[in-house]
Amino acid sequence: MKLLSVLITFLLATVIYSQTNPATLTFTVQVYDQFPGYNNNFQTNGAGARVTGLIKSTLNSTTRVPELVSTATGGLNGVGLILNPSLFPYFFSPQQDSSLPGQNSPLSLDLVFTYDTTRNIYVYNNQNFFPIDNQGLDVDPAKRIYLNGATYHNYHFCMKMNTVFTYKGYEVFNFQGDDDVWVFINNKLVIDLGGVHGPLAASVDATTLGLTIGNSYNFDLFFCERQTVGSTIKIETNLLFVCPFEDYCGVCQGDGSSCCNPLTTCNDNNQCTIDSCPPANTTIGSGSISDYCIHTPKINTNPIDICFNYQCNSSTGNFDPIPIPCLDRSSECLSTIGCNSTVGCQYESICNSNVCNIQNQCSSNGTCVPKSSNDCGIELDGQVDKCKIYSCDSNGGVGCIKEDKCKPSEDKCHVVSCDSLTGSCITTPLEDPLAGLHLCSIARCNSSTGEFTYDPIICTPSSNPCISTQCNATNGQCYETQIPGDICDCGCGIPENKCKVSWCTPEGICQPKFKSEIDDNNSCTLDSCDPCTGIISHMTAPQCLSCNQCSN
């Protein structure tokens, strides 16, 4: 069984100017209910002892709560049964978030001091000091598991008292107690009874602290009950405490946590705010404390991204990325293809998807510029060919195409060509491949096939039957020649005399004459012709029968 008995004696000087002291004084202090399941520095069940030097000798002037000298386990902390140094800050500071270690429940407690007229001191004496039974965390029956025999009490809590007194020059105080008790005057540690231990006593003579009469000094008392099973407290004081301010919970220099829980009192159901209680010195006027809560917007800790704005999700508290809309640049023929976190919005020309548009070129009215025939000419040939017709076919991504301006004639006997300087179409007859070889023939072209045939030139006959007309193969001209009379058929034959033929004179007169072959021009023959049969005979002349020396 553990006995908690704290005896702190604050000797009060007689009130100056014979002021009558009230019969009772009520001082509201801050209490932090603890539960061993949340903070294992409580109910360690170890063999404790008084340990000095656990906390720093100078009080933190900002937080005004003690700080451990070391955060290491073991050593002095182990002797003082501080098994988990990381949770020590929650001995005297609020931690109301159940999702985090070290949860406690802040409460306020009124200590009522009674004036002892015989000794001119105020006394608080409670030999069964269980001020927060069934309160704080122990509102949950499952937490009421620590007993003294069959009797339940709340054995795990810490208390702090932060106030100010004006030094008169004669103050002293004495106390007796068990478990952690630390007292600071002027932010200096003057009582050091750390650890889990039995009742111990200590005294402080304020006249030995180098204080100046008339000056005001901080007085800070810290007390913890950390283990079952007994608890007593007795306080006697003649110090004239002055409370610089009370928090809105009524606690002297309190932090507001005894009546304000940021997770419940100040919960605005918006996960995008950090809810906190009002500053401790806030004056609560009309309305409730929750009307004065502070709701600080959460700060986005995501790296800056020029493609996204981060917006807090009020349901989750997470910062969701919201894409930043890219500018509409359709008037520049540009479409968005996404955003790059380094350079921002990316665009591409809508004109580039059509092969018949000039790449990356947009008109002033926001439409793509189509390729002209000249553009296609330059693209295909390096320059415009006047003998070509250029166009662009977007179907199937074909792009620029060209065709001859001058189309072949349907008449195969004519050739269509183009003047490269003017682009004019010129039609010329198909050239005879045998031209010059058949001057006495007329070449004829088949318009369906383009093939040539050749008809001979017919020269006009002469009216003179003794004149022949014919074509000159060297120049293709018709010319006349005289037909020898003996072969000229004048049409005046003598049928009754078969030894004669027609003879045509140069004048064209028909005169019959003997056939020329009757005369063989041999003087040794006698030439004759049978007029009836036309048989020619050549008999030897008589004069040539003997000599055979006839001359021709």
Curated annotation (Swiss-Prot):
GO annotation, cellular component aspect: extracellular region
UniProt keyword Transit peptide present: no
Annotated signal peptide: 1-18
Source species, domain of life: Eukaryota
Compartments it resides in: Secreted
SMART domains from the UniProt entry: PA14 (SM00758)
Disulfide bridge positions per record: none
Residues carrying sugar: N60, N281, N313, N340, N365, N446, N472, N521
Keywords, comma-separated and alphabetical: Glycoprotein, Secreted, Signal
Main location: secreted
Domain PA14, first and last residues per copy: 114-255
Short name of any one Pfam family annotated for the protein: Dicty_CTDC
UniProt-listed PANTHER family: PROTEIN PSIB-RELATED, PROTEIN PSIB-RELATED-RELATED
Family, as annotated: Belongs to the prespore-cell-inducing factor family.
Record-linked NCBIfam families: Fibro_Slime
Protein name as it appears in the record: Protein psiB
